């Protein structure tokens, strides 16, 4: 179920402050965050976030198409090794 419109998008307050500081300083330094649940806002466009996936930090460069999505959507937590090969076909 989607979040109520009257509540607005959720963004971690500390992440919002860091993003505003980075915009003012116009620095290219990535913002390190553990907040995968935060929604990407229009003022985040052009910034780079290092999003933690439970193992390491994944760099996420925010573009206009990402606005409205969550940061965690762009840092996968599971690796898919692929389906097992058909053993009969290799003979």
From Swiss-Prot:
Classification via PROSITE patterns: RIBOSOMAL_S19 (PS00323)
Gene name for this UniProt entry: rpsS
GO process terms (BP): ribosomal small subunit assembly; translation
HAMAP family: Ribosomal_uS19
Keywords: Ribonucleoprotein, Ribosomal protein, RNA-binding, rRNA-binding
Matching NCBIfam families: rpsS_bact (TIGR01050)
Bilayer-crossing regions: none
Cystine residue pairs: none
Pfam families: Ribosomal_S19
Name this polypeptide is given: Small ribosomal subunit protein uS19
């Amino acid at each position: 179920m989607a979040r109520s419109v009257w509540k607005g998008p959720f963004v971690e307050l500390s992440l919002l402050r860091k993003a505003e500081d980075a915009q003012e300083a116009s620095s290219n330094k990535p913002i390190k965050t553990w907040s995968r649940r935060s929604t990407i806002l229009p003022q985040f466009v052009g910034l780079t976030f290092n999003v933690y996936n439970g193992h390491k930090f994944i760099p996420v460069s925010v573009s206009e198409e990402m606005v409205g999505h969550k940061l965690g959507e762009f840092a996968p937590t599971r690796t898919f090794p692929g389906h097992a090969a058909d053993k009969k076909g290799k003979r």
